[in-house]
Amino acid sequence: MAGNTIGQLFRVTTFGESHGLALGCIVDGVPPGIPLTEADLQHDLDRRRPGTSRYTTQRREPDQVKILSGVFDGVTTGTSIGLLIENTDQRSQDYSAIKDVFRPGHADYTYEQKYGLRDYRGGGRSSARETAMRVAAGAIAKKYLAEKFGIEIRGCLTQMGDIPLEIKDWRQVELNPFFCPDADKLDALDELMRALKKEGDSIGAKVTVMASGVPAGLGEPVFDRLDADIAHALMSINAVKGVEIGEGFNVVALRGSQNRDEITAQGFQSNHAGGILGGISSGQHIVAHMALKPTSSITVPGRTINRAGEEVEMITKGRHDPCVGIRAVPIAEAMLAIVLMDHLLRHRAQNADVKTEIPRW
């Protein structure tokens, strides 16, 4: 199976399945001499970890990460960093009924069409369980970006179903289980989640991720534009069906005089572009949004077929998230960090000596 690696200089390769013995990843390209411990990675893993609230799957995985290589005496050595997380709470028997049945809306049908077989236990490689390793690798990138460049990456839920969430206070994001920046909407979110659990249904969501302190100049035209790589990274997250950079699809209703980010001696006057112009960072906040579909793992009966092509009724068993967008917030942060880390290393390799006299803000 190809397609398990992202990045050019900062490269992350993940492996493992939902109900396998463990998940792991290899992180290449980390500069030497960076202080790094397992505790540095654990914080974000705990934010993504299942079973931490009544609103997410009750699969209880400690997600304790182990650093296997690439760190000596508490600092990175410049060699490959190996990371491992053991699976401890698999209930594979929950999936025995779908061994020969294709769950609608899942990768069961397409995986078997491609490979001629599939791991039906929790979706195998197609499960979002794999994203734990992205978060671990992304934590390395977030640490480097923050300490060396002052770059801060943060994300939040900005819509669940038909409930829009305004970014009122970033401090609120870590104070509630929804990663919600709008405290006034917490009761509405709770009511929606309770209704979904009662109905056995699910709902979609929108997640916003932002990076501040990013220097101007990151991005490689034309096929490795920074926004293209960010979109690629976010679209690779399970259940993501759409990505917007900056104003995104809202630009359709705008005129050029409204959308252009005018510049004065004090700097840019707006940021409709999301901090990227011509595929290269402008020095403004980088802003991206992603839409996540409602999970198909629901107890509402639905039609599908078995491997013999016979129509059957399907009710999903197991432990699942009514809204996968909630735990996607730290995953989105990780993927943005991985892309920015890669582009910073690439920019430094080619353009470290470039000096310009034009203003920076």
From Swiss-Prot:
Alphabetized CDD domains for the sequence: Chorismate_synthase
Gene3D superfamilies noted in UniProt: Chorismate synthase AroC (3.60.150.10)
Entry coiled-coil feature ranges: none
Positions bound to FMN: R125, S126, S127, N238, A239, G278, K293, P294, T295, S296, S297, R319
Record InterPro entries: Chorismate_synth (IPR000453), Chorismate_synth_AroC_sf (IPR035904), Chorismate_synthase_CS (IPR020541)
Record PROSITE patterns: CHORISMATE_SYNTHASE_1, CHORISMATE_SYNTHASE_2, CHORISMATE_SYNTHASE_3
A biological process from GO: chorismate biosynthetic process
Binding locations of NADP(+): R48, R54
Cofactors, names only: FMNH2
Catalytic activity from the UniProt record: 5-O-(1-carboxyvinyl)-3-phosphoshikimate = chorismate + phosphate
Pathway assigned in UniProt: Metabolic intermediate biosynthesis; chorismate biosynthesis; chorismate from D-erythrose 4-phosphate and phosphoenolpyruvate: step 7/7
Cofactor note: Reduced FMN (FMNH(2)).
Sample GO molecular function, one term: chorismate synthase activity
GO cellular component: cytosol
EC number: 4.2.3.5
Keyword Lyase in record: yes
Keywords: Amino-acid biosynthesis, Aromatic amino acid biosynthesis, FAD, Flavoprotein, FMN, Lyase, NADP
Subunit structure: Homotetramer.
Sequence similarity: Belongs to the chorismate synthase family.
Function description: This reaction introduces a second double bond into the aromatic ring system.
Protein name per Swiss-Prot or TrEMBL: Chorismate synthase
The organism of origin for this protein: Salmonella typhimurium (strain LT2 / SGSC1412 / ATCC 700720)
Lineage: Bacteria, Pseudomonadati, Pseudomonadota, Gammaproteobacteria, Enterobacterales
